[in-house]
Amino acid sequence: MVTGGAGYIGAHVVRALLDSGLKAVIVDSLSSGFADFVPESVPLVAGSILDGDLLRDTIDEHGVTGVIHVAGYKYAGVSVQRPLHTYEQNVTGTAVLLRAMQDRGVDRMVFSSSAAVFGTPDTDLVTENTPKNPQSPYGESKLIGEWLLRDQAVATGLRHTSLRYFNVVGSGVPELFDASPHNLFPLIFSALADGKTPRIFGDDYPTPDGTNVRDYIHVSDLAISHVAAARRLDAGLPLEPAYNLGSGDGVSVAEIMATVAEVTGIAFEPEIAPRRAGDPARIVATGELAARDLDWSMRHSLRDMVESAWKATRRSSQPS
């Protein structure tokens, strides 16, 4: 069962499951996902993870043996204005899901966590052991989610792992696009479509070109590691409690802007705006443990990420 399987990331996970010969059923409220993202062969149960009866019925009807939990409220900045909603969806929702799993004897979960659990780390390379210091209700809710899995494992023997990912971009198939109004790629593409100039917030950071450096990963690479984690849990093989899915090498915002201009053929000079408060110069993670256990690797270049995202965005904006 894939919660949030009609969303941008969840839909890629579902396709990776199908490509590996596994079956899936999706539970998604469709509050930010799209029914059109769901393959025809995959059952879609439209409903909330806060509905325990619906979850138990879905587990019974479809013979669910494990869960990949992608559903949740994912906007770190907005979570500051909506803390109760964030905790309800991400903490209460995860607890309700775990209760339904326990009631039906389902003992395997792959949890989509986030780099937001680290906050603003004071290190050039984030590892799984980097101190956790979330700085938003979203980051806090994801860390609590990891704790819920840990405590449930002690109490019931739940087999689990959490995948912490950073900036997810690109598209595995043109039909699946990132519609978030808060993520960098959609913001750039939206600005270009409206004839506006994309903005860079600060060009005076202590980085090679003065702009923020972040860890960008392709959504298809991320999806493959979710499937690898699920397969290891199915096989009873050991997994770490959490893995960072990082490249080990960051990309600057200026590099992304230049690649976007090259791919789209739209020449532009980004507008330089003041720094945003609390925006760190660099956040990059190692993916060594995930490479060892979860078939994790960066199979896609920055150009691949931009090209696939641009293609999917253009397709989504065309009239049907």
Where are these regions (language model features)?
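Residues that form or immediately flank small-molecule/cofactor binding pockets and catalytic motifs
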Residues: 49, 131, 167-170, 203-205, ...
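N-terminal Rossmann-like NAD(P)+-binding domain of SDR-like oxidoreductases, especially those catalyzing
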Residues: 1-164, 168
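Short secondary-structure boundary/capping segments
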Residues: 35-36, 123, 189-190, 234-235
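C-terminal substrate-binding subdomain of Rossmann-fold SDR/epimerase-dehydratase oxidoreductases
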Residues: 192-320
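Short, flexible, glycine-rich and Lys/Arg-enriched loop motifs at helix boundaries
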Residues: 35, 166-184, 194-216
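Short-chain dehydrogenase/reductase
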Residues: 87, 135-143, 178-186, 215-216, ...
